[in-house]
Amino acid sequence: MSFLRNFFGTTTTAPEVQKEQKEPVRALPASWYTSQDMYELERRSIFSRKWLLTTHKHRVPNAGDWVQYDAAGYKFIVSQDEQGEIKAYLHDNSLSPVHVHIDRNGFIWVNLDSSETPEVAWTDDFDGVDEQPRFDYYNFDEYVFDHTWDMEGDFNWKILADNYNECYHCLVAHPDIPTIADLNSYYVKTKDGHIQHYGAQRQDQIDNGFRIATTYFWPNASCNVSPNFFFMQRFTPVSPTKSVMRYEVYRHKDATDEAFTLISDMYKRIMSEDKYLCIHTQKNLNAGVFVNGLLHPDMEQGPLHFQSTVREVVTQHFNKEQAAGHEIWPAKPPFSVDAPAIDETDIAFRTGMDTYADADNLQESLASNLAPAIAV
């Protein structure tokens, strides 16, 4: 924890997420992609309390269907009960219920906050995201679950998000993409907890089934939908320097084998190419030489929005913990008043975290990073 205090300083003011940047902005420092303390803070501030896009109702279409998921060490189950309701539970001894939201397109979101009402409402970050006009071209009820696949790699989950949300590398790294979209017209729209990706498409590309709508859902999920298929991608953190890229693939009920295989295999190639880009990026960060660079306000607008949101959320949570004098884990169920007293040393041992009295490094490190980020 000493890293945290050195980074943040005694108290910090979380910078607002900028809607429009005119000058380059300082990126997150390399230590945020390697530090165990920062990873634990992200587990508390992000994955314990924010809404996580997880799956689609077609994944559990029948009563009794269930699937286990994980997010930064939190394991939970999504199921359909005998009454046809979609529910979720922590995969622990108590099977504590998890908050669920199903949007108008059938996507299932979970919030691991153990409070009766989550601190963060779904509409706080995603109001209207399921009503994008471009979704009018698709009927999500006409798709069926087809298969899953995944890739594990030695990279921080944020590297995956940074890579996904810009495309100036696409022309060189992804030879398939120019066949389905005009990279010269690529741009993103950012709002609250989502990043919408756009690129003009020729009529022949649309006729071949490549009318594609792509959205990134902060913190760690995305969806690409086309007339023949859609796939969901989740960047699942395992440690500060290891993540799993998990995919759920859905097929339109009228898609031919040829049309479905064409686009499904293409995206598998693209995602595999991204994996190796991210592995090499993490290696550079692990070397300990690079500190942080600048983000271009236009070409890297997606990563800029993603990183600004990370910086804001973790800083606010750290300040809340400072005021409380202890770590705050929203996903942990409150202790019953009838339960035996908990030994504080036992809690510290289980979490593997140092006490706040030793948490100097992260606070100072954050403070030193936030100042230039705000100034620029």
Positions of PLM-derived features:
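N-terminal pre-ligand scaffold of iron-sulfur
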Residues: 2-90, 100-101
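C-terminal catalytic domain of Rieske-type non-heme iron oxygenases
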Residues: 3-4, 60, 77-82, 99-376
